[in-house]
């Protein structure tokens, strides 16, 4: 141990000296490259994979550090002397060299904390070859500072750590294509093993080892290391594990450089290390010009058996690589893998097919079909469903459910369903029975044939022919079993099973009779064994093909006893006849008592099997019925839950309060009649207490009890779109970061718009009256075409089409509508009113005269269809007409949110509350203030006040912000017992609000072509507003972003389902004619499906182009010049309101 410690001390001293020498070598730059290579050859050879790879990766390090020859020689001599003094080193070691193999090459990258190395001996002649290669390499690329640093780190390691880590360094480290993009390719390398035999001449034999597959290859593979950079260090650490340095302890004998035979002579030194390996790495390219070859020596002491076999041999491992060979390796591996995977997948496919086949058979055995009481969305309800539902609720006794003899459900629908399921169950079992009995037949057939030939029947050919004929027929029957179970014939499985089993039992019963009659009985004892064999054969065939079908039909098949008794009777009759005939013909062979016992046995077995079948069928029927009832109840619960979820309305806080109070009242009423005061009273009072707490929570959580709860919506996107439609008057600045460039003082961008402007013209009442005188009423009256009431009350009346075809469509439709009201208003006042109303509508894509006319027509139509129009007073009808035609008068094509965000004067006047709706009502009564246009001037002041309030309420109700509030109020009133819109004016008002709102958004309930056109128009307005908002650096309003055009379909579906449908659904509750359900809601659902189809097909939704329409209008004939006298009163009204 002392010598070992001295050796370690020498190593440490040597390391210190080397550190000093390295510093000197860095300062020494005077020696040439040739001197450096010469000194290295004399003293030591150092090659590290670390230094090589670092040079390869770091192209910037082009400065070459020269070596100080004198210091290297001096240090290596000291090292050699210290080793010579050690007694642990044998004399043979003096002839060898020390080889250090290190695991780290990336210390400079801060990846490894320590550099571990192992040390072992090799013959000098091996190192000679390595040094020769190193010389050639160094002539091209001299040693760098990295290599010297690696040498210093390698010799500074503890020898004990080196020895412990020796086993961890293997030949098979990966040097495959160092490309960080693919780590897996680094394991694909090949080793060429060159074995040398101990003989006078050395024989080399190439063995190619493919490491990934452990298969021999016939081609050499090469691996190129290139295209690496500094970012690849981390992956390089995973791919290259070894760096190698050579340490020479003695001078190299130049005479042994090319002497390969010295390898064999030096094998005596391998007793301690067992083998020597020479590894050549080829193909390391640098800048595609330098090719370096490192010959290194390594060993692996893990494989003891392999090392003992080659104890006397020198194994030469060559790693050859190139860029092209890597592809071959991958190809070969892939081919092997593909072949293996193909075979494996084929087996898996076959196995999966069989598994699926038998799984389907098993599934059919446990499945209960319920088609008889299932409902189809496309077909009308099955009448059997109601019958079965009634039977489910009337299951009070077994007598009412089942008829015991024969077993049968009293309800024909349940019996039909039971038979349907029987066929399903039996069909799967027929396949199994067919397969099993076929296998059994193929076993029995040759055995019975051999028995027949060796028995007394061998001389009678017709018996053998009959047997084979019956076996062939029996085989066909069994094959038919499989066919029935596997094809569409399975719906007749029960009937076919009875027929086939009856045929099988009858055939072998007749065979039993024939074979019994032809049996020759000879009392000679020598022939008794043969006769016994013959009887055994008869018994086997009788039980397998005669009695076994009975067992199957009674136990394995869920058959019905009212039919399978026939098979039992056939078996008893034929087999009893057989034994009776044999007993009569050969009484000596079959005594009478034996005949009696056999008949009793057959009869008893059949009776007990039948009783068992009856009991089993009874149990199956009860289980089937219970499962059927349970399934029906589960389906009903599931259906109720779906209906509850789908019908769950968007409720307001006030509705929740009312419902909770109703529930609380119901519980309190139940408590009044409660008898169990100990338990139920406490439970129900606690329940009421919880309800009241929820009421308090609802009352205090919001200042507006008509706010809706969006939590009922499952999809968050629906909430987003609903808020976009019903919250258009809320500023986008609330709670949000203020966009840059927005002026909060007064944004005049919209004020300067052509639609609404305060400084365009300055008109007064005198000028307006002057223009009114210019209206040629008589000429207009002649041009107007009146429309029939039936056409106006048709829901499919298309205003878009009519406006394209008629010259004065606005006057045609609206004058026809006002004429349906019994009034005494002069025609000239009506025409003047209509002229001013038409002129106040702007030429925008959606909110124009066409929309106003459509709403008025749909308002009239809905009132007629609901049956309330004829019950209304004429002044209420007139209110409906004025509200409908003026509900969007003066609409600029921008919504309330735009006015609020732009701080428009109208928004300031109306305090951001229903800006446009207030504006529409204001313009309406500005027109009615004109004596020549006031169609209400003949009413009393009281009626006028009432009508004015109604008109204002109806126009303001078209603000979508109040959409769900109005629906909630109507629902609350409708559910009240005293709801009466004829006697109660408040009920009438809320009802008319519902109708005008339905008319306002009625385009969702019309035909798809018309609905699609209206959607194109409203999109055009939305996007125009969005463009204006972007232009003025305002926040984009919902639905106005052109970049989100792909959301149109989804937004329309949400609008129809969650905004329009609740409105029509509430109206359907007062619709005795069922028009809403059969027409409006049906169209709504159909249009939703169309939008959903467009969304799935990703169809592009075209947007209405006003420019193209204007160009089209120019080509039309010019309108009457008198029509140009219509006055735009918008500016006048705004000016007066502002004053």
Swiss-Prot record:
Question: Which enzyme type, at the first EC level?
Answer: hydrolase
Compositional bias ranges of the Polar residues kind:
29-42
Kindly list every residue the record annotates as glycosylated. 524
- Among its keywords, does the record have Transmembrane? yes
Per UniProt, subcellular location reads as:
Cell membrane; Endoplasmic reticulum membrane
Gene this chain is encoded by: PDEbeta
PDEase domain spans which residues?
Answer: 775-1098
Q: Where does a divalent metal cation 2 bind?
A: 888
Q: Which organism is it from?
A: Plasmodium falciparum (isolate 3D7)
Q: What is this protein called?
A: Dual 3',5'-cyclic-AMP and -GMP phosphodiesterase beta
Alphabetical list of Gene3D superfamilies matching this protein: 3'5'-cyclic nucleotide phosphodiesterase, catalytic domain
Q: Which residues bind a nucleoside 3',5'-cyclic phosphate?
A: 847-851, 888, 1000, 1052
Under the cellular component aspect of Gene Ontology, which terms does the record hold?
Answer: endoplasmic reticulum membrane; plasma membrane
């Amino acid at each position: 141990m002392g010598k070992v410690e001295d050796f370690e001390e020498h190593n440490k001293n040597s390391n210190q000296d080397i550190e000093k020498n390295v510093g000197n070598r860095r300062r020494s730059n005077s020696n040439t490259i040739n001197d450096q290579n010469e000194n290295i050859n004399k003293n030591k050879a150092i090659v590290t994979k670390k230094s090589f790879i670092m040079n390869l990766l770091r192209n910037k390090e082009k400065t070459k550090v020269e070596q100080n020859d004198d210091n290297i020689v001096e240090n290596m001599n000291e090292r050699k002397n210290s080793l010579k003094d050690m007694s642990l080193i044998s004399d043979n070691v003096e002839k060898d060299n020390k080889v250090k193999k290190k695991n780290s090459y990336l210390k400079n990258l801060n990846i490894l904390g320590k550099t571990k190395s192992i040390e072992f001996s090799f013959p000098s002649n091996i190192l000679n070859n390595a040094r020769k290669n190193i010389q050639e390499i160094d002539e091209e690329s001299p040693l760098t500072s990295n290599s010297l640093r690696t040498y210093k780190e390698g010799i500074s390691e503890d020898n004990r750590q080196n020895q412990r880590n020796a086993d961890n360094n293997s030949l098979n480290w990966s040097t495959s294509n160092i490309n960080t993009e693919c780590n897996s390719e680094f394991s694909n390398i090949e080793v060429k093993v060159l074995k040398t035999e101990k003989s006078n001449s050395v024989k080399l034999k190439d063995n190619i080892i493919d490491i990934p597959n452990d298969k021999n290859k016939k081609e050499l593979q090469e691996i190129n290391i290139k295209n690496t950079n500094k970012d690849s260090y981390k992956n390089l650490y995973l791919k290259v594990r070894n760096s190698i340095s050579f340490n020479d302890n003695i001078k190299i004998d130049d005479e042994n450089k090319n002497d390969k035979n010295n390898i064999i002579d030096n094998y005596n030194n391998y007793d301690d290390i067992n083998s020597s390996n020479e590894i050549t790495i080829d193909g390391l390219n640098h800048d595609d010009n330098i090719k370096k070859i490192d010959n290194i020596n390594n060993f692996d002491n893990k494989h003891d058996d392999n090392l003992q076999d080659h104890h006397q041999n020198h194994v030469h491992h060559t790693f050859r690589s190139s860029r092209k060979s890597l592809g071959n390796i991958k190809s070969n591996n892939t081919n092997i893998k593909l072949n293996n995977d193909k075979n494996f997948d084929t087996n898996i496919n076959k196995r999966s097919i069989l598994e699926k086949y038998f799984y389907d058979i098993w599934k059919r055995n446990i499945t209960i079909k319920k088609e008889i009481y299932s409902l189809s969305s496309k077909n009308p309800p099955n009448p059997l469903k109601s019958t079965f539902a009634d039977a489910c609720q009337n299951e009070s006794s077994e007598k009412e459910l089942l008829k015991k003899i024969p077993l049968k459900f009293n309800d024909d629908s349940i019996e039909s369903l039971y038979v349907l399921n029987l066929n399903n169950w039996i069909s799967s079992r027929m396949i199994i029975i067919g397969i099993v009995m076929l296998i059994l037949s193929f076993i029995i057939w040759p055995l019975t044939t051999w028995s027949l030939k060796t028995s007394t029947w061998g001389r009678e050919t017709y018996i053998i022919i009959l047997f084979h004929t019956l076996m062939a027929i029996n085989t066909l029957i069994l094959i038919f079993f499989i066919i029935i179970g596997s094809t569409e014939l399975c719906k007749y499985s029960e009937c076919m099973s009875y027929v086939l089993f009856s045929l099988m039992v009858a055939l072998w019963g007749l065979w039993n009779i024939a074979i019994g009659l032809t049996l020759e009985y000879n009392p000679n004892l020598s022939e008794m064994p043969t006769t016994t064999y013959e009887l055994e054969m008869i018994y086997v065939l009788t039980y397998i093909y005669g009695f076994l079908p009975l067992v199957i039909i009674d136990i394995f098949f869920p058959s019905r006893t009212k039919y399978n008794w026939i098979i039992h009777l056939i078996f008893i009759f034929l087999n009893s006849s057989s034994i009776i005939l044999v007993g009569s013909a050969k009484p000596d062979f079959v005594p009478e008592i034996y005949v009696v016992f056999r008949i009793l046995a057959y009869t008893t077995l059949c009776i007990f099997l039948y009783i068992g079948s009856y009991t089993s069928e009874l149990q199956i029927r009860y289980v089937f019925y219970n499962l059927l009832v349970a399934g029906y109840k589960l389906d009903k619960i599931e259906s109720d839950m779906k209906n509850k979820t789908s019908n769950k309305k968007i409720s307001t806080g006030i509705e929740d309060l009312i419902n909770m109070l109703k529930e609380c009242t119901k519980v309190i009423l139940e408590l009044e009649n409660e008898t169990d005061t100990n338990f139920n009273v406490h439970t129900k009072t606690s329940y009421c207490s919880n309800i009241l707490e929820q009421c308090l929570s609802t009352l205090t959580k919001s200042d507006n009890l008509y706010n809706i709860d969006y939590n009922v919506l499952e999809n968050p996107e629906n909430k987003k779109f609903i808020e976009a439609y019903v919250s258009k008057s809320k500023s986008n600045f609330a709670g949000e970061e203020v966009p840059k460039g927005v002026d909060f003082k007064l944004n005049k961008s919209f004020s300067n718009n052509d639609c609404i402007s305060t400084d365009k013209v300055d008109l007064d009442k005198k000028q307006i009256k002057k223009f009114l005188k210019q209206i040629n009423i008589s000429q207009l009256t002649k041009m107007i075409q009146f429309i029939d009431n039936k056409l106006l009350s048709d829901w499919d009346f298309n205003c878009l089409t009519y406006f394209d075809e008629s010259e004065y469509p606005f006057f045609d439709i609206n004058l026809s509508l006002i004429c349906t009201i019994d009034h005494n208003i002069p025609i000239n006042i009506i025409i003047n009113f209509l002229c001013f109303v038409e002129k106040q509508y702007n030429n925008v894509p959606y909110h124009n005269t066409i929309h106003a006319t459509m709403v008025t027509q749909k308002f009239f139509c809905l009132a007629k269809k609901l049956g309330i129009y004829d019950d209304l007073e004429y002044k209420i009808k007139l209110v409906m007409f004025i509200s409908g035609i003026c509900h969007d008068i003066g609409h600029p094509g921008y919504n309330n949110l735009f006015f609020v965000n732009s701080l428009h004067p109208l928004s300031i006047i109306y305090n951001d509350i229903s800006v446009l709706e207030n504006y529409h009502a204001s313009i309406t009564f500005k027109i009615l203030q004109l004596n020549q246009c006031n169609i209400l001037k003949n009413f009393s002041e009281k009626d006028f006040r009432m009508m004015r309030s109604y008109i204002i309420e109806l126009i303001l109700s078209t603000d979508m912000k109040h959409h769900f509030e109005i629906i909630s109020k109507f629902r609350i009133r409708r559910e009240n017992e005293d709801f009466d819109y004829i006697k109660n004016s408040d009920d009438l008002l809320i009802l008319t609000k519902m109708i005008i709102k339905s008319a306002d958004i009625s385009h969702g309930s019309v035909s798809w072509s018309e609905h699609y056109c209206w959607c194109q128009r409203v999109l055009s307005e939305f996007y125009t507003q969005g463009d204006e908002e972007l232009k003025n650096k305002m926040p984009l309003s919902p639905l106005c972003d052109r970049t989100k055009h792909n959301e149109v379909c989804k937004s329309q579906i949400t609008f129809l389902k969650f905004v329009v449908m609740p409105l029509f659904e509430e109206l359907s509750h007062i619709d005795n004619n069922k028009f809403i359900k059969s027409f409006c809601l049906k169209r709504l659902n159909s249009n939703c499906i169309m939008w959903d189809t467009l969304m799935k097909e990703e169809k592009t939704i075209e947007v209405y182009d006003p420019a193209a329409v204007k160009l089209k209008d120019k080509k039309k004939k010019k309108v009457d010049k008198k029509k140009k006298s219509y006055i735009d009163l918008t500016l006048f009204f705004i000016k007066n309101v502002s004053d």
